[in-house]
Amino acid sequence: MKRTWIYNATIVNEGLKFAGSVVVEDDTICEVLQGEVRPSVPCDAEIDARGCYLIPGVIDDHVHFRDPGLTHKADMASETAAAAAGGVTSFMDMPNCNPQTTTLEALENKFADAANKCIVNYSFYFGATNNNTELLQQLDKKHVCGVKLFMGASTGNMLVDRIESLRKIFSEAGILIAAHCEDQTIIRWNTELVKSKYGEEDVDILFHPRIRSEEACWRSSSLAVQLAKETGARLHILHVSTARELELFEDKPISCLLYTSPSPRDMRRS
């Protein structure tokens, strides 16, 4: 059993920043020490981290590595190398690749591929569709991190828009549901409205806030929250983008605070 002492570091952890050291026993942190306190037991190796920050391994629970099928952009080998270099030691990958991770076979193949390519810890979301709800109860919940649910259309065309399918997903998933929430009916209506007024060709990006509007976001998010309350499902709503939606979570934990705050005003300036 090898013990390594990393000392003279600036430790960043749980909202605190302090000078100190860490003792690692094989691959497990066994002591976190403040100031010049020395380890309780002598160590086999020492690393002077003067001038460096020392943080726990970061867990990124929402990545798109585009593997399989879109590996001209990136793959699990390249992205986990970048992750490790930046201190990210675990990731959870989304299912809108090619083929989509919407069957048990595709999910198993992705785990097998990751075992050969990944140099950090990994898990994968299973993609829900209108037609695969019968597979949810067959998922290995010790290894699958959650079910990705597109309640609005996005990359990969995995929209789930049948209320009976949504109810079944919320009642039978048995693991975390990570939902992309935009009401597709409102989006279609807004798209046609913009096209009728400004023309069919290449709708300008400036119309994005009108098409994927506050109402579209709120309507879908409120439905997701309602279904979660009715079924007791564990729900995460991803990339919330409106103040109105935040009202749905006033008494709920927020695990990722706002990290970017552009508005339609900023789009006009860009």
Predicted regions and their residues:
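Histidine/acidic-residue-rich, glycine-tolerant segments that coordinate divalent metal ions
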Residues: 97-108, 112-227, 244
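Histidine-centered divalent metal-coordination motifs
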Residues: 62-66, 180, 239
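Active-site metal-binding motif and surrounding structural segment of the metallo-beta-lactamase
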Residues: 38-54
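Short catalytic-loop micro-motif centered on adjacent basic/acidic residues
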Residues: 93, 123-126, 234-239
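Metal-associated gating/positioning segment near the N- to mid-region
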Residues: 52-117
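Hard-cation-handling environments
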Residues: 241, 250-261
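Single conserved hydrophobic/aromatic residue that forms the stacking wall/gate
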Residues: 259-270
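N-terminal metal-binding scaffold of metallo-dependent hydrolase/deaminase domains
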Residues: 1-41
